From Swiss-Prot:
Descriptive protein name: Uracil-DNA glycosylase 2
Keyword DNA repair belongs to the record: yes
Top EC class for this record: hydrolase
Organism taxonomic ancestry: Bacteria, Bacillati, Actinomycetota, Actinomycetes, Kitasatosporales
EC number: 3.2.2.27
Any one cellular-component term (Gene Ontology): cytoplasm
Positions of the catalytic residues: 67
């Protein structure tokens, strides 16, 4: 089964045209060739996991990441998130530290962010696959065009949303978003390289204030312990 067959129904209506584009055919062939050569993450059935977890009509917040974790068993298709039982990565640890300082939420024993996705937080990486052990190895192969279409699809809905763009890479996507209609929360990336500027930026308060103003229930950022 090809990765495209996994595209969730709620997104198929707005992204179906992308699947017919020549670039997407080339991208699919590239990923299949990569899988034939060695491990590619996430597994085929989780490439579109972020879209499956947060249906198109339920997106309140879109958080943009860069590319998947490249270690075996780490990622599961949602940006910043790792499977239960996997050590919380540095950027996510910093996100948790900011949440604790800003909201008082306890730091959880896991990095599994599915509770956010189920509340309408689309955790989207710009690139949806990666070769084992090689960060950014599937950059520039076509995923960026596809995920730009995802961003545009959310931006083109009648309902406003909140877009979270941490770091220079994510902020390059600003031209895809009408800032008159939507709220964009910008700031430093939570990576250890830029965390000093990330800490104290209070993004979660900004997000929830905007979500409430847009007429939706604010996000409960608490991640339950799994231990």
């Amino acid at each position: 089964m090809t990765d495209t067959a996994m595209l969730p129904e709620s997104w198929r209506g707005v992204l179906g045209d992308e699947l017919q584009q020549p670039y997407f055919k080339e991208l699919t062939e590239f990923v299949e060739e990569e899988r034939a050569r060695g491990p590619v993450y996430p597994p085929r059935e989780e490439v579109f996991a972020a879209l499956a977890a947060t249906p198109y009509e339920r997106v309140k917040v879109l958080v943009l990441g860069q590319d998947p974790y490249h270690g075996e068993g780490q990622g599961h298709g949602l940006c910043f998130s790792v499977r239960p039982g996997v050590k919380t990565p540095p950027s996510l640890r910093n996100i948790y530290k900011e949440m604790k300082e800003e909201l008082g939420t306890p730091i959880p024993d896991n990095g599994y962010l599915m509770p956010w996705a189920e509340q309408g937080v689309l955790l989207l990486n710009a690139v949806l696959t990666v070769r084992s052990g090689e960060a950014n190895s599937h950059k520039g192969k076509g995923w960026e065009k596809f995920t730009d279409a995802v961003i545009r699809a959310v931006a083109d809905r009648p309902d406003p949303a909140v877009f979270v763009l941490w770091g220079n890479y994510a902020q390059k996507k600003l031209p895809l978003i009408d800032e008159e209609r939507h709220v964009v929360v910008k700031g430093a990336h939570p990576s250890p390289l830029s965390a000093k500027k990330f800490f104290g930026s209070r993004p979660f308060t900004q997000i929830n204030e905007a979500v409430a103003e847009q007429g939706h229930t604010p996000i409960d950022w608490t991640i339950p312990n799994l231990g």
